[in-house]
């Protein structure tokens, strides 16, 4: 996860189950990670930060929280879950370019979150899908040569927030975590 060449001179936080209670007020923050872990952290960080740049390593399907019992959700057919996720993405992200960057392949996992797309659309939030070339003293340099200057880098890789694997016949395990609207981990 942090095996990028180069050295960053600012603050580096590694996701280890923390809720965004760190001080991000007025800061330029980079969040590097997969869609599920980023979905959990982005709303809390964006509420404080002046600018947030999300470096997405992998997209995941995002479905809104449904007022349905967990056993019913666990038995939902993969095709139905994928259809709900696609409709959620289309409904919440009108910009076709951004939507294409947020669309995972059909084997991607699914995270439950109510505000990820809404937060990502805020003017001070930006999605970057170019691969990272290296860390620089003042930020993150992507392979397109752009150096994104930030004060803090948060590495957000945590597969525990992938709650289901689509198209592989997996069921939501009873111990799986779901990501809530406030970014809190909740039992399935």
Language-model region placement:
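N-terminal FAD-binding dinucleotide-binding subdomain shared by FAD-dependent oxidases/monooxygenases
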Residues: 1-6, 21, 34, 39-41, ...
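Extreme N-terminal leader/targeting segments of oxidoreductases
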Residues: 2-16
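Short coil/turn connectors at secondary-structure junctions
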Residues: 26-27, 50
